[in-house]
From Swiss-Prot:
Catalytic activity, reaction form: a fatty acyl-[ACP] + phosphate = an acyl phosphate + holo-[ACP]
HAMAP family hit by this protein: PlsX
Main location: cytoplasm
GO biological process, one term: phospholipid biosynthetic process
Family stated for the protein in its record: Belongs to the PlsX family.
Protein name: Phosphate acyltransferase
Record gene name: plsX
Keyword annotations from UniProtKB, A to Z: Cytoplasm, Lipid biosynthesis, Lipid metabolism, Phospholipid biosynthesis, Phospholipid metabolism, Transferase
InterPro entries named in the record: FA_synthesis, Phospholipid_synth_PlsX-like
């Protein structure tokens, strides 16, 4: 098992990326391959590939194709050639997404790959797709997202995943025309597997196993959840601090429970999002990822390798399309 990491991708590159890779190397099996300028990646105790160029966070998407010696391009190239089993990058979404679709290639029958992320819910995890790759989509694309989300959810352990369409209300007639059209298509293709419209709060409640959205709405929902998680933990800390001795004593007695809650709410624990619908495992880590987030992103990639997520999605899409009922 080999997982390549873009050492130069992200706001905190290269230091936090290197720290995260070293942390992950102690917890994952197989090799972690560093990709970046030789003077930065050598002598770190991990295999490396020298890359002289960098795709910057503000670079337009096409730069990933132009900069053939960049860490991002070379990582995707290694993946497409089968020399690594997964590629992780905290680099800019646009270039990474274009590179994944152009260099690694799209799965047959998928017009628009999407970002899929498993976010914590009261029932375990909810797959949110698309989490930020496609700002504007057609209703037909949302059906493809549902197929990929179902397959991903099954990989996570759901036996009969149910799908919800993110909307401004639960009623069937809510939302703009494209969403109404998507509702009808999902109802037609998925049958009883389609739950109907869901709202933002349903994602963390676990009302459904898969929430389908355009990339703009999905990304806003994801970032809102991240902010809410930080708010909850910050308010809890302040309340304990302001509550005096008894509050501090109670917090000490409940430290293990609080730590578990904090870990579950910590956005860094999500690790990263899969670019679903391409022929290899590509994980997009948050642009502001620190070492902990990078470590978890690499572990997400490891899990994708272990469960053969690309093959499962390919098989799941074929099965769902043929069955027409989402199972």
């Amino acid at each position: 098992m080999k997982i390549a990491i873009d050492v130069m991708g992200g706001d905190r590159a290269p230091d936090e990326i290197l720290k995260g890779a070293l942390l992950a190397s102690k917890e994952v099996e197989g090799e972690i391959v560093l990709i970046g300028p030789e003077e930065i990646v050598k002598n770190k105790g991990l295999p490396f590939v020298s890359a002289s160029e960098i795709v910057k966070m503000d670079d337009p998407p096409l730069e990933v194709l132009r900069k053939k010696n960049s860490s991002m391009h070379m990582g995707l190239k290694l993946l497409s050639e089968g020399k690594v089993d997964a590629f992780v990058s905290a680099g800019a979404t646009g270039p990474l997404f274009l590179g994944a679709t152009s260099i690694v290639g799209k799965l047959e029958g998928i017009e628009r790959p999407a970002l899929g992320v498993a976010v914590p819910s009261l029932k375990g995890a909810t797959v949110l797709i698309d989490a930020g790759a496609n700002a504007k989509v057609r209703p037909e694309h949302l059906v493809d997202f549902a197929f990929m989300g179902i397959a991903y959810s099954k990989v996570l352990g759901a036996e009969n995943p149910r799908v919800g369409l993110l909307n401004m209300g639960s009623e069937e007639n809510k939302g703009p025309d494209d969403i109404k059209r998507a509702y009808q298509l999902l109802k037609e293709f998925l049958g009883d597997t389609f739950f109907g419209n869901v709202e933002g709060h349903d994602i963390n409640l676990g009302t459904v196993d898969v929430v389908v959205a355009d990339g703009f709405s999905g990304n806003v929902a994801l970032k809102t959840m991240e902010g809410t998680a930080k708010l909850v933990t910050s308010v809890l800390k302040e309340s304990i601090k302001d509550g005096g001795f008894l509050s501090l004593l109670g917090a000490l007695l409940m430290k293990r429970s609080f730590d578990k809650m904090k870990e579950k709410l910590d956005p860094r624990s999500y690790g990263g999002t899969f670019i679903l619908g391409v022929k290899g495992i590509v994980v997009k880590a948050h642009g502001s990822s620190d070492a902990k987030a990078i470590k978890h992103a690499i572990k997400v990639a490891e899990k994708g390798i272990r469960v053969n997520i690309v093959q499962e999605i390919e098989r799941g899409i074929s099965h769902v399309r043929n069955s027409g009922d989402g199972r």
